[in-house]
A protein has these predicted regions:
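A short, charged/proline- and glycine-enriched loop
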Residues: 15-26
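A conserved hydrophobic helix/loop-capping motif in glycosyltransferases and polysaccharide synthases
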Residues: 25-36
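Short, charged/polar "capping" segments at the starts of alpha-helices
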Residues: 35-37, 64-72, 163
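Short, acidic, metal-binding catalytic loop of nucleotide-sugar glycosyltransferases
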Residues: 42-55
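Acidic ATP/Mg2+-coordinating residue in the GHKL
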Residues: 61-64, 127
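Active-site-proximal specificity loops/subdomain of glycosyltransferases
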Residues: 66-120
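Short beta-strand-to-loop acidic/aromatic patch adjacent to the donor-nucleotide binding site
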Residues: 118-130
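Conserved catalytic core of nucleotide-sugar-dependent glycosyltransferases
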Residues: 132-174
Length: 174
């Protein structure tokens, strides 16, 4: 894979140390569709490999029956291990696309709440957004470079398009 980084943007050992000390709260939205469990498993596996001080995953899903919730809990337990993931079912969504916003109360209560949560970073992912520890290290390094300018690093989401015959930017609609 060919990548271009700004001078000094490659993560340093100091950035790696900072990344390994992280205590991460991660929400993954997953509108329950059984055929998408494999994609969710891939996202969870990438997170399970993070060599960080602490990582907790909250699977935010639509209103599902207990059997489907049990499937999600078993998948999370198998990949993440005991006590590292929970399932949060959201009831009464007017539109299925509203699920993408249901992590906001979790940020308010668990990350920014009135008591010190101990978390240093929050990640929002969806069941088809694989985020590696290398991505996290890049963010840590780029964040420091951009801090004085008041900017934050970003990622461009891409996915494979059969129609285009290649990768396309997921969030570009022109």
């Amino acid at each position: 894979m060919d990548r271009t980084f700004a001078e000094g943007a490659l993560p340093s050992s100091q950035d790696g140390d900072r990344a390994r000390r992280a205590r991460i709260l991660c929400c993954i939205t997953f509108h329950f569709v059984r055929r998408r469990l494999e994609s969710l498993a891939d996202v969870l596996q990438a997170l399970a490999e993070f060599p960080v001080a602490f990582l907790e995953v909250v699977l935010v899903t639509n209103s599902i029956d207990e059997s489907d919730a049990s499937t999600l809990r078993r998948l999370a337990l198998e990949i993440m291990g005991e006590g590292r993931a929970t399932v949060c079912r959201v009831e009464g969504l007017d539109n299925p696309f509203d699920l993408a916003w249901q992590h906001k109360p979790i940020i308010a209560e668990r990350f920014l709440g009135p008591t010190d949560s101990g978390f240093t970073h929050f990640l929002y992912l969806e069941d088809d957004i694989r985020f590696s520890f290398q991505n996290f290290e890049y963010f840590i390094a780029a964040r420091e470079q951009l801090r004085d300018a008041g900017l934050l690093p970003a990622f461009v989401r891409t996915e494979w398009s059969e129609v285009a015959g290649g990768l396309v930017a997921t969030d570009c609609f022109w």
